[in-house]
Amino acid sequence: MKSELNLPAGFRFHPTDEELVKFYLCRKCASEQISAPVIAEIDLYKFNPWELPEMSLYGEKEWYFFSPRDRKYPNGSRPNRAAGTGYWKATGADKPIGKPKTLGIKKALVFYAGKAPKGIKTNWIMHEYRLANVDRSASVNKKNNLRLDDWVLCRIYNKKGTMEKYFPADEKPRTTTMAEQSSSPFDTSDSTYPTLQEDDSSSSGGHGHVVSPDVLEVQSEPKWGELEDALEAFDTSMFGSSMELLQPDAFVPQFLYQSDYFTSFQDPPEQKPFLNWSFAPQG
């Protein structure tokens, strides 16, 4: 950001509390020009503190911002400390800035992630500077129609020097385990075939291998063509043609065991004696 601001080489911005109030905050509230425009103007209370460094104009371990002072009530003096997914909480006593005359007030705040009053304390710190002894009934800036204490100057830093991020527990995405998915009462799978597993001692780790349902269907398909041919031949050898069965003078059923047609399907049953009964009309 230094190149964009055209800052001189070796420039460092480490102002004291009094310098921040006298040369920056007072001039901002009075709409006067600031010699080194290195402080960004944002609505600080709309963001989490770890999002602010990217919005700053300058800074490495601490960042400075002008922010409108958001109040809980339009005509009141109590500020609204809600910010981002958490809130800022004041800590310690206010510190007067300026001697012999007090120009501003410094307040220290700590960011808590989550909803008040059960938020999680973080390492993000804010020093908020506001003007002191402001007559709220008559102190209206004619150029921007803001009260003189409507602007605050904020210094943001992490006391551990890290970019820690915190999120409320109820906003963390829930991870569904494999066990929960398998126990779901609704099966959203497109496949309607059951998965078959067989033990395979040769596989590594002793895991079974999956048999495809398509393979099972081909292997279990009966040979209907061969079976029909065998039944037709068996029927013809036992009873002959349909014309022979219609002869009125003689009916000679022959029960012959035909084993040749069933050898490819099952083991033949025990052989029984050959039966040949002939019935002739009595004279």
Curated annotation (Swiss-Prot):
GO molecular function, one term: DNA-binding transcription factor activity
UniProt keyword annotation of Transmembrane helix present: no
Biased composition (Polar residues): 175-195
Alphabetized InterPro entries for the sequence: NAC-dom, NAC_dom_sf
Superkingdom of origin: Eukaryota
Pfam families for the chain: NAM
Keyword Transport applies: no
Subcellular location: Nucleus
Disulfide bonds: none
Main location (coarse class): nucleus
GO biological process: embryo development ending in seed dormancy; leaf senescence; negative regulation of DNA-templated transcription; positive regulation of DNA-templated transcription; regulation of cell size; regulation of photomorphogenesis; response to fungus; response to jasmonic acid
DNA-binding region, residues: 103-165
Domain NAC: 7-159
Factors inducing expression: Induced by wounding, salicylic acid (SA), methyl jasmonate, drought stress, dark and sucrose starvation. Induced by chitin elicitor (chitooctaose). Induced by salicylic acid and infection with tobamovirus (TMV). By indole-3-acetonitrile, salicylic acid (SA), sodium nitroprusside (SNP), salt stress and drought stress. Down-regulated by brassinosteroid (BR) and transition from dark to white light.
Note: Plants over-expressing NAC081 show enhanced susceptibility to the necrotrophic fungal pathogen Fusarium oxysporum. Plants over-expressing NAC081 exhibit abnormal developmental phenotypes such as dwarfism and leaf-yellowing. Plants silencing NAC081 produce abnormally shaped seeds.
Function field: Involved in disease resistance response. May function as repressor of pathogenesis-related proteins. May function in the regulation of host basal defense responses against viral infection. Transcriptional activator involved in responses to wounding and infection with tobamovirus (TMV). Binds to the DNA sequences 5'-AAAATATCT-3' and 5'AGATTTTT-3' of CYP734A1/BAS1 and CYP72C1/SOB7 promoters, respectively. Acts as a suppressor of the brassinosteroid (BR)-inactivating enzymes CYP734A1/BAS1 and CYP72C1/SOB7, and prevents their expression in almost all tissues.
PANTHER family on file: NAC DOMAIN-CONTAINING PROTEIN 72-LIKE (PTHR31744:SF233), PROTEIN CUP-SHAPED COTYLEDON 2-RELATED (PTHR31744)
Free-text domain note: The NAC domain includes a DNA-binding domain and a dimerization domain.
Quaternary structure and partners: Homodimer. Interacts with AHK2. Interacts with AHL12 and AHL27. Interacts with the helicase domain of the tobamovirus (TMV) replicase.
Protein name from the UniProt record: Protein ATAF2
Native source organism of the sequence: Arabidopsis thaliana (Mouse-ear cress)
